[in-house]
């Protein structure tokens, strides 16, 4: 009887609530319905805050400014000479290098929500954001400080990520960010590392084998499959899940072990100036899973809203985030990924969406 009254009083709301109950909204990569997110986060965050962490933790960003004429000159020179048959899908797409000032907002989120971070490193190719004044807390690191000369310049994120452990003075424990990943709420250090140094492994519910069976063809999937194959061969451990598209807690010593064990495999793809289907994705797959196998990482939960910043759905995601901000139910993080140029000129749209969200 109560349902009938509700239906006749406001049929549109009744139908909306009925559909939401039957088909819950899922915006994250762990198959958690929107109305259950905050319950899980509240309990997780309480547990993650119980034991203090007394070791230093750094943050590492990789960043590029595609509007820099000198960078464009280098990019165009090597783009014209590359064999397009051997580069991965979207590897030459300008969207991979587009700058919408995401770093300004992502860096601001780290400073605001992760105040316990010791130092922030921004890895670039002879660039520095014009709005940034580096200091002891925020340092800009050039590729030449990490990567051997014969592999430079490189426009391959997998090559850059393979050398993160060579950042001068980097802490043993660090968190790797792409500049399109944003911390959405205050988080304790325990969200990323246990007090005994074990790293969080933010595992997705997605399946590598399912994506492959569907015909997905990207350098990221190829690198994950190749990495999983190597680990399965050496440790008899089958891996079928990628990580959530968010920040990645890492340990410098595990990079060193990975290089010791797989130096030949790593060296093989370092000459690839653009991403190919023969790369390994060390920072975002190989090393996190090697860390798990070695017992220094454990599966953990990060509720991250992941969406294509160029798609029509982007505005809906930002609206959901704005509503969650008002209700105090924001996820741990979100990723406004810019992965192809089907939308011809999204620059102002993406910049406006970010500006509107962070100005609220």
From Swiss-Prot:
Alphabetical GO biological process terms: polysaccharide biosynthetic process
EC numbers on record: 2.7.-.-
Key words of the record: Exopolysaccharide synthesis, Transferase
Keyword Lipid biosynthesis applies: no
Single GO molecular function: transferase activity, transferring phosphorus-containing groups
InterPro entries the UniProt entry points to: Stealth, Stealth_CR1, Stealth_CR2
Function: Part of a group II capsule biosynthesis locus.
Family: Belongs to the stealth family.
Remaining remarks: Stealth proteins are part of a protein family that is conserved from bacteria to higher eukaryotes. Family members were first identified in microbes as proteins that help pathogens to elude the host innate immune system. Microbial stealth proteins are involved in the biosynthesis of exopolysaccharides. Stealth proteins are predicted to function as hexose-1-phosphoryltransferases.
Protein name: Capsular polysaccharide phosphotransferase LcbA
């Amino acid at each position: 009887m109560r349902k009938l009254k509700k239906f006749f009083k406001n049929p549109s709301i009744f139908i909306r609530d009925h559909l939401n109950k039957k088909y819950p909204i899922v915006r994250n990569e762990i198959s958690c319905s929107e109305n259950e997110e905050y319950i899980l986060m509240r309990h997780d965050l309480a547990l993650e805050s119980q034991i203090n962490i007394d070791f230093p933790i750094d943050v590492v960003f990789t960043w590029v400014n595609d509007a820099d004429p000198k960078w464009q000159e280098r990019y165009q020179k090597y783009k014209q000479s590359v064999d397009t048959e051997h580069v991965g899908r979207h590897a030459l797409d300008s969207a991979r290098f587009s700058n919408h000032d995401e770093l300004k907002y992502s860096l601001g989120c780290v400073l605001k929500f992760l105040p316990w971070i010791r130092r922030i490193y921004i890895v670039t190719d002879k660039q520095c954001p014009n709005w940034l004044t580096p200091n002891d807390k925020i340092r800009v690191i050039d590729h030449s400080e990490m990567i051997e000369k014969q592999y430079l310049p490189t426009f391959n994120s997998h090559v850059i990520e393979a050398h993160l452990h060579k950042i001068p003075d980097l802490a043993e424990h660090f968190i790797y960010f792409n500049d399109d990943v944003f911390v959405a709420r205050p988080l304790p250090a325990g969200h990323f590392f246990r007090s005994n140094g074990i790293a969080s492994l933010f595992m997705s519910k997605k399946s590598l084998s399912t994506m492959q069976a569907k015909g997905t063809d990207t350098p990221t999937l190829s690198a994950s499959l190749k990495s999983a194959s190597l680990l399965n061969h050496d440790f008899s451990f089958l891996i079928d899940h990628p990580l959530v598209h968010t920040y990645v807690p890492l340990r410098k010593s595990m990079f060193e072990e990975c290089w010791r064990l797989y130096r030949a495999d790593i060296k093989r793809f370092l000459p690839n100036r653009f991403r190919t289907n023969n790369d390994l994705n060390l920072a975002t797959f190989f090393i996190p899973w090697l860390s798990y196998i070695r017992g220094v990482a454990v599966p953990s939960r990060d509720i991250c809203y992941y969406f294509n910043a160029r798609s029509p759905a982007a505005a809906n995601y930002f609206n959901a985030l704005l509503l969650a901000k008002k209700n105090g139910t924001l996820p741990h993080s979100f990723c406004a990924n810019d992965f192809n140029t089907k939308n011809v000129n999204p620059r102002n749209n993406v910049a406006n969406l970010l500006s509107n969200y962070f100005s609220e």
